[in-house]
Amino acid sequence: METFICRPERGGPFPAVFLLMDAPGIREELRDMARRLGTVGYYVLLPNLYYRAGRDTIFGPDVLEEGSVERDRMRSVRTKMTIPPVMNDVATMLTYVDRQSEIKRGPVGCHGYCMSGPYALAAAARYPDRIAAAASFYGTWLVSDAEESPHLSLSKVKGELYIACAEHDALAPLPMVEELRTLFGRAGTAGEIELYPGVHHGFAFPQRWCYDKPAAERLWERLIALYRRCLG
């Protein structure tokens, strides 16, 4: 599994953080996000979760354009993604971090955007004694009829969760967000669900038409504060 790794140049050991990609896949925009976390003291792993589809899983910039060849190619890979294999990938990364002297022993963080929001929450439930903090940023369909829907395992989470939702998001509509709030409270899960008013799905990515800098910076503030509390 090809993984981009970023860490501070000096000091250490550092807490480990898993950054799980959104549907358009690995690109410089995500690497920059990993670097930003590295500058504040974290050892960041950014895996290419599409690796099972073969080597040709890096898409061109028009992957964001509806009807483009790259977007269709991405969707053909994306639609085959499910939670169980990704949980195996998380297990592989946990094994890796345990073997690195530059990584601080103890809790790990995990956050995901878009399609990986559910993966981050599922990882917190699957590995509750390892993942002390997890975040979903405009995660898609966090409540669904799927057998592996993240809402079904909220009660297994021991760490703290932060779930950020966009007001305008067809992949996480407001009725779903409200249902998730109810289920979140019922499960007694530690953390917060925050609705970002006036923004659209993808608002945290600087290269998107919907980028909203104030909301994106607040997202960074929330994420870093979460990791400071839970990982150090």
Residues covered by each model-derived region:
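N-terminal cap/leader regions of alpha/beta-hydrolase-fold enzymes
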Residues: 1-232
